[in-house]
Structures are given as structure tokens and as C-alpha cells.
């Protein structure tokens, strides 16, 4: 019997680690483009997993997690850009559409 190894339908390797300086109030065009691409990738993954869960009868909804992706991506970039200033832990109140803390 031949074993097949299905591939994940999204290329998660396109995620681009981004380091932002939290003291800088503006983004460069390149930083903005990277941030937007990372947000879209994560949102697409959330929708994918919600849809495949729905197909199995075990899903909820994308609402809160989908809505908080921009905050999470910005926090991740701050964690990378100034690691000495942050404890790199995300608290999201279970994705119930509250601000990520």
C-alpha cells in the first residue's frame, strides 16, 4: 500500500516574522505590506479551520479570533522588535471579541 502525505492547502511558510519598534509611530511601506500579508494569512487559516470543523460538525464561528488577528500580529512584531520590554504571552479572553491583552 502506498502512503500519501497530503499537503496543507495553505503555504504557512509565507508568514514573515516582523520586528517593530514600539516607540516608532509610523510604519514603512514594507512593514505595512508585511503586516497586511501576515494578517491575511492568519485570517485565511482561521476561516479554513472553522470551515473544516463545520464539515465535521465540531466548529464554532470565526468572529472573535478573526477580529483580533491585527492586534495579535502587531503584538508579535513588538515582541520581536523589543523582546526586553515584553513578556511574550498573548491573553485573548478566549477570542470573545475583546482586545488582546
Please give the residue ranges for each predicted region.
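Thiamine diphosphate
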Residues: 2-101
